[in-house]
């Protein structure tokens, strides 16, 4: 299996499929690169090179005790980009992976980046505070960590239902998918799982958003109960000049599965022609409800 080594020696597993302009897929918490199995085949078939890696501590990557802050995670992404010598790449970040996109570009620049996509992303910040009064209270994340400490399998099983809107949004999500999600999540180290809750909940990305100088697509579920849209995508879209903002009005957080019939075509349109080619779908303020 292919691996790259990061600055501190942590080995990251990655998948590398196809040829053409690179698309780097950055998974969300608490999953790994396999979450992209419903997007990767369509991207490869359309002529793109798809690289999907496991974040440190997750999936098949090494599980160190430290390094789960966003500076280190962004440096890990840089190690991958440099080792594979990727240029004109599109960075696609889902959920906490959107934070890596933002921090990578603000920390390392956009010389290797042609465009960016934020899907259900935590940017520009989730935690409630003076600069984010409508954010998520710290107690919510404290309860998540306590649940992980107390009974991680049970917590992850319950979390998976909210993740896909099962039983809440009338989505038909199979028991097999929920079991797969929990199994993938359990591959991660408990240290990484809890440390990343702290990272994605407490990190303020407002200062990173100015780095989005490349064409950017923002996609979010209007019914996302995991990463509420009003404290994330609605704010991010106002901070990224000329971003194309797509809201899947009734979609949950796990829209890479529930709404793949909308997500995949939107990705391909954006990749194929950039933000200009897709701009006819904008409404006032750049926001489109679909």
Task: Give the location of each predicted region.
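Conserved alpha/beta-hydrolase catalytic His-Asp/Glu region
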Residues: 127-136, 147-210
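Flexible "cap/lid" loop of the alpha/beta hydrolase fold
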Residues: 102-107, 111-150
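Catalytic active-site module of serine/aspartate enzymes centered on a nucleophile-bearing elbow/loop
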Residues: 242-290
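Conserved acidic catalytic loop of the alpha/beta-hydrolase fold
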Residues: 71-89
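Conserved HGGG/HGGXW glycine-rich cap/lid loop of the alpha/beta-hydrolase fold
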Residues: 6-66, 80
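Conserved alpha/beta-hydrolase "nucleophile elbow" surrounding the catalytic nucleophile
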Residues: 27-29, 89, 93-98
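Short beta-strand/loop motif that positions the catalytic acidic residue
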Residues: 212, 218-220, 224
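Conserved alpha/beta-hydrolase "acid-adjacent" motif
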Residues: 225-231
């Amino acid at each position: 299996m292919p691996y790259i080594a990061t600055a501190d020696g942590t080995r990251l597993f990655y998948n590398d499929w196809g040829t053409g302009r690179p698309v780097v897929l950055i998974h969300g918490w608490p999953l790994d690169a396999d979450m992209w199995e419903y997007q990767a085949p369509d991207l490869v078939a359309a002529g793109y090179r798809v690289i999907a890696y496991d974040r440190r501590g997750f999936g098949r990557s090494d599980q160190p005790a430290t390094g789960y802050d966003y500076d280190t995670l962004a440096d890990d992404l840089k190690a991958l980009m440099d080792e594979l010598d990727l240029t004109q790449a599109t960075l696609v970040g889902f959920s906490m992976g959107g934070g890596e996109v933002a921090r990578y570009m603000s920390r390392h620049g956009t010389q290797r980046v042609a465009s960016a996509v934020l899907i259900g992303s935590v940017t520009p910040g989730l935690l409630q505070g003076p600069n984010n009064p409508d954010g998520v209270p710290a107690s919510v994340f404290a309860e998540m960590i306590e649940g992980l400490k107390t009974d991680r399998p049970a917590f992850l099983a319950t979390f998976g239902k909210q993740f896909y809107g099962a039983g809440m949004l009338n989505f038909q999500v199979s028991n097999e998918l929920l079991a797969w999600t929990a199994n993938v999540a359990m591959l991660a180290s408990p240290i990484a799982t809890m440390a990343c809750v702290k990272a994605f909940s407490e990190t303020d990305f407002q200062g990173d958003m100015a780095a989005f100088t490349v064409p950017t697509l923002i996609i979010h579920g209007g019914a996302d109960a995991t990463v509420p849209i009003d404290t994330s995508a609605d704010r991010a879209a106002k901070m990224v000049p000329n971003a194309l903002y797509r809201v899947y009005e009734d979609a949950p957080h796990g829209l890479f599965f529930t709404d793949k019939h909308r997500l995949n075509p939107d990705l391909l349109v954006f990749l194929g022609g950039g933000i200009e080619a897709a701009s006819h779908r904008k409404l006032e303020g750049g926001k489109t409800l679909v």
